[in-house]
Structures are given as C-alpha cells and as structure tokens.
Amino acid sequence: MKTTTRIIISLVGALLLLVLSYAQFNSPKPGPLGNEKKIIATADRLKLSPKQHVSYDDSIVMIDVHYDKTLLPVYDSTGYCLGTTPITDRGKILALLRQLQQSNYRYIIMDVFFEQGDVTPYDSALFALIDDMDRIIIPIHNFARQNSLIPIEKTGLADYETTKKESSFLKFPYIVGSTASIPLKMYQQLGPNHSTIQRHSGLFYTDAGHLCRRSVFLVMDMAKMLTEYDGEDNYYIANADRYTLGYDALGMPPDTNEMAFPLLDTGSYDGKYVIIGDFEDDVHNTYRGSQPGPLILFNAFLALLHGQHHVSILFLLILYVIYTILFWILLGKQKLKDSLVRGIRNPVVKRLTATIVSLISYTLLLEVVCVITYWRTGKVYDLITIGAIFTILSNIYHYTYDVVQIQKNKLL
C-alpha cells in the first residue's frame, strides 16, 4: 500500500472511530461486554483511584419512608374490591412538606411515586402544596403512569437501562428523547448559569458551550461514598443523617395516634438537600454492591455538578492521535506485535520484548488508556469495544493481504 493512501485511510478511519466512540459515550446502555465495570476493577487493583470530590455528607438529610405505609383498596372495572396495596402514607408526606415549607432547605428530592388511580383524601392538598413549593422534584417512570395532578415541571425521569450481559446499574441517562431526568432538572436550577444538556445535529450534546455526553457511568464513591459496605455487598448509610418519616421527622409513632418528640425541626433542613425515599426496598445492584435508588439520583446530580459529563476536546485530540497510530500499524505488512519489536537488534532483548509484546493487543492498549483517563480525571470511558473493532479489522486486513500475496505468488 502506498504511503499516501495509508495516511489517508489512517486519518479517515481514526475520525470515524472517534465519532463512534463519542456515540458510545452517549449511549444510555452499558458497554456490550460490561467494559466500564472492568475499567474500575482494574484501576482498583492497581490502586489508581482518582481523587474524591468535596464531601456532601453534612449537606444532606435523608428521610426514609419505608416504615410509613398505608393500605389502599384496589377495585376492578366493576367496582369489586380485589384487596389492598401498600403505598407511602400521603398524610405524613403532606405533614413533612408543610414542615419543610417553613424551612430554608436547599432542594428536595422526593423519590416517591404517585401512580395514576391511587387516590387518597390528602391528594388535593398534597399536590397543591407541591405545586406551590420551589426546588422540589418527583420521579416519573416510562413503565407507569404518573398522577395527572402532579405539575409536569416538578417531575423528572428516574429510569436507567441494562443489557442481557450486564443487568446491574452502571450508566445513568440524563435525557431520554426530550424528557429530562431528576438530576438534570436539579442541575438546571442549581448549576452554573445556563446549565443544561442540549442536543445538536442528532448526535452531539453540549452544556453551556462545552461538549458533553448525555449518559455517564456513575462513580458511586463520589462524596466520600454516602454508603459503605459490610463485605457482603450489603450497604449501610455512612457519614450522613437518615431518619424515619413518621417517628423521627414528625414525631408520629407507627400504628398509633400518640405523638412523640420529633428529632428534626424546621431548622434541621436549612441549607440541606432533603432526600425522601424508601432506603430499604428501593435498592439496585451496582458495581459497588447494592445502592438505594434515592442516593443513585443524588450521585447522578453530583456527577453533573462536578462536570463528569463534560468531554474534553484535548482528550478527543489525544484519542484521535492514538487511533491514527493504531490504524497506521494495522495497515502495515506486519501485525501489531511484530511492529512493536521491529528494529530491536539485540537477540536477547528482542526475544524478551517479543514475549512481553505477545500479551499486548489493541484491546489491552486501549484499556490502559481507559484506566489512565479514569485515574487522572475520574471519568470512565469505554474504549475496549473500539479495541475489539481494531482487532477485527486487523484480522480481516491481514487475512485479505495474505490471500492476495498467495495469489500473486501463484501467478509468478
């Protein structure tokens, strides 16, 4: 192959793979081989964990609704009562929000779902109060209908995608179609001016002029890990305050009309992120073990606040250079391993180098890039899939090259 042709193919091929890489960064689904989790595991083994961000442990108050349920009758289309279903006690939610309205809270994440058709005597007052409050967000889900009385501007998506290969939570999508997630709506209100994720030309996303991605692999140990583990993938809340809704926050013991002394007053919420949700049942498998859903949402917000979704132009330029070099090697007469030992004259050194190089592949080289990037920036990018593509292209090219050479030799 002529040098000029080889250069052009290398430059164009590298550009195409760079665009493919960015598209994969934006995908709401984890890598096809669970590559992101592999990158974290490799970095942990090598003790190359990035520096953690400023702790938010003393800036949150967690309200657990797990023990505050009420039974709601369920009827069929004829009006026959089929039984009951437990829902979060909306009377206690209303009482808590009235208390919060008197405080100077920073933001409320109320990870409590109000499904269409579930009706209680408190709904009118509760939803009117939610509409009247500032800096409060409630989840919606693609698989269920939200109560139509909830103002749409006070809701955000709280879903994520998995694959057959990887069923655990890995990546959080900040925007799906035109629907913004809970963390993104929080970021729009609390982040720097004009903070949001905007789509351009069907592929590219920006945040206030910065190239970014709409989906991020969450580094769950952000903020000094709001949860810790007992060694068996069971979590417990660490370095943060968690209270039950009825007993601790409202002073209302369960199954009784008696009043107790609440542990919290209006001043307890001043300047705090108030996270309301079920910390016992609403748990999800992650690469760090089980995590409660409300804290996943908060971690996703912190990732935005610290620019984890931003994609550095310098990083893309470095990646483009790496891809170009790998394409140049791929299009050579020799395979990657042979190219790396070419030019070594000392037979002992050459043999030793060949042994080491025999373990090297395109996938391994790009995995090293992933680990170094995570170590230096705290951001996880899946380049291992691109490494697999390089390997496939290399095998196809050299197989075709060998076939052509054999045919030429036969003609001679």
Predicted feature residues:
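Flexible inter-domain connectors and hinge/loop segments
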Residues: K2-Y323, T391-L412
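Loop-to-transmembrane alpha-helix initiation sites
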Residues: W375-A388
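Juxtamembrane interface at the cytosolic side of transmembrane helices
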Residues: I325-L364, V369-W375, Y401-I406
